[in-house]
């Protein structure tokens, strides 16, 4: 990709631009090249991208969201029949990165030394579903899972509104997370 050769074209007066580059494969990274008021080129991530590079990098990643094979059709049909006013509702609000991280080691006194490495969405799904059911919760509310630059934050400095954060895996891993929660009745 070369911003001088591959220029986007505007679709009428819609404010929408498009570009086709043959041979792009899933996993390819890309950015938009935009000229500022001084005419200097700047590289920016796709504000509508659905997958981003792992921090500290910030390019958008080509990803096919249609390849995941959902298994929650029965849960979705059952949910449509439910009246939420007829059953108790107990919501567990959780930030995935704060809730659990991988253990680096265990001290002599048995305390864990928690590391900075995250579990992935698939691993978190199993652990969180077990915890939520054990504690009697019926629903979960995730604190921001959109892409954001800083691990120390809860994700409110969003850089990719349509991209689940890559620090826990791919968009397919996130879809698995949701699918698994539904399979557990959550």
Give each language-model segment a name.
Residues 8, 62, 75, 161, ...:
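Short clusters of hydrophobic/aromatic residues that line enzyme substrate/ligand-binding pockets
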Residues 1-7, 40-42:
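Surface-exposed loop/edge segments in extracytoplasmic proteins
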């Amino acid at each position: 990709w070369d911003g001088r050769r591959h220029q986007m074209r505007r679709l009428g007066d819609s404010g929408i631009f498009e570009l086709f580059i043959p041979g792009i494969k899933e996993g390819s990274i890309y950015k938009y090249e935009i000229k500022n008021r001084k005419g200097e080129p700047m590289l920016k991530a796709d504000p509508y991208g659905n997958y981003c590079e792992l921090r500290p990098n910030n390019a958008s990643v080509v990803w096919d969201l249609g390849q995941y094979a959902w298994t929650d059709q029965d849960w979705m049909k059952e949910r449509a029949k439910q009246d939420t006013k007829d059953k108790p509702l107990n919501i567990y609000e959780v930030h995935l990165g704060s809730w659990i991280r991988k253990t680096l080691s265990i001290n002599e006194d048995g305390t864990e030394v928690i590391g900075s490495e995250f579990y992935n969405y698939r691993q978190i799904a199993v652990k969180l579903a077990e915890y939520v059911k054990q504690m009697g919760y019926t629903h979960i509310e995730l604190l921001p899972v959109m892409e954001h630059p800083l691990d120390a934050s809860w994700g409110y400095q969003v850089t990719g509104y349509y991209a689940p954060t890559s620090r826990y895996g791919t968009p397919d891993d996130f879809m698995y997370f949701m699918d698994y929660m539904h399979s557990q009745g959550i």
